[in-house]
């Protein structure tokens, strides 16, 4: 029979998965919005759901820390969850920023580079895999997410080059800047997915890549 502590950890996993799913949804919606889909309000609503979920998970983590006083790997897991939800909340904010930009992109009838859509797909996958790595305690998977960030960065650099060429030809400078900022927000979402994966790695090993956050050693 599961202990109360084990049930709380399971609830934490469920809540993290739910918040991760909301992040996946809001990224996909933002990609649709820049292509003219009427989903801007849904993006803002989902961002609010993410904010609410962050507060709920914070409260759960604080209850676990105060009442259960976990040690070693369990403590790292709860501590990592607190850091992860901060990055997930930022993903929602940046998707909302993309939604704001989409209004101007649509108004100017600008064709959106396919690479921006590819960036959205990559970041959705990275968020999914980083959350899976947390729940499954899969060190290999979280390191894959960290490595995959290079693909998002490469795509962003290609978008910059493509937009520079289009602006040199006949693309309106304001429209080009809006598209560039959209790609930049997607690139930042990828960075947040990496941050999530790095905190998963910390939860599993006790060592953060920045070597600033070490707690409980490298043993479970």
Indicate residue ranges for each PLM-predicted region.
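Cytosolic, long alpha-helical scaffolding segments
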Residues: 1-220
